[in-house]
Amino acid sequence: MNDRELDLTEAQKAIKAKYPAINKKYEYLDHTADVQLHSWGDTLEEAFEQCAMAMFGYMTDTETVEPIDTIEIESEGDDLESLLFHFLDDWLFKFSADAFFVPREVKVLQLDRMRFTIRSIGWGEEFNLAKHPQGTEVKAITYSAMQICDKEKPEIFAIIDI
């Protein structure tokens, strides 16, 4: 399943047409009772960005989101895996418990591989069922089968609980 097809209203289609298409470097892999996100990028920072967008893309069609507001996130971990976990969990918190914020784009501003800290920014808006199609709720991020391949073309595999 390369892209989730959601039934879009004419208003949602109009918003999508207003902005350039999002360059998606992620896919969804089948996993028992959960969903595995697979993201990649030219850099590890881009793979992190794409992993966050894959998570949001499972909840709604991010191309219907307008870049009206910005939110910055700072996360930290004990290693790269825990950093990825907290990065995704902090973004999920902004959606589910805090501001109901859904980004159109997430950009990593700084990734410190020695201190395991990351700063990122998202451009988007408050999730609104009248405006954004409802996908599947993401309940939590898991450490299960998490992989970060930091090679020439970095890849990330992360499982989300739905």
From Swiss-Prot:
The cross-references to SUPFAM superfamilies, in alphabetical order and at most eight, read: MTH1598-like
Q: Which InterPro entries match?
A: Archease, Archease_dom, Archease_dom_sf
The cellular component terms of Gene Ontology attached to this UniProt record, alphabetical and capped at eight, are:
tRNA-splicing ligase complex
Supply the Gene3D superfamilies for this chain.
Archease domain
Q: Which residues are connected by disulfide bridges in this protein?
A: none
Keywords, sorted A to Z: Calcium, Metal-binding, tRNA processing
Q: Which GO terms describe its molecular function?
A: metal ion binding
Sorted alphabetically, the Gene Ontology BP terms of this entry are: tRNA splicing, via endonucleolytic cleavage and ligation
Q: Which residues bind Ca(2+)?
A: 34, 161-162
Q: Name one Pfam family in it.
A: Archease
Describe the function of this protein: Component of the tRNA-splicing ligase complex required to facilitate the enzymatic turnover of catalytic subunit RTCB. Together with ddx1, acts by facilitating the guanylylation of RTCB, a key intermediate step in tRNA ligation.
Query: Which family does the UniProt entry place this protein in?
Result: Belongs to the archease family.
| Subunit relationships | Component of the tRNA-splicing ligase complex.
The protein in question is named: Protein archease
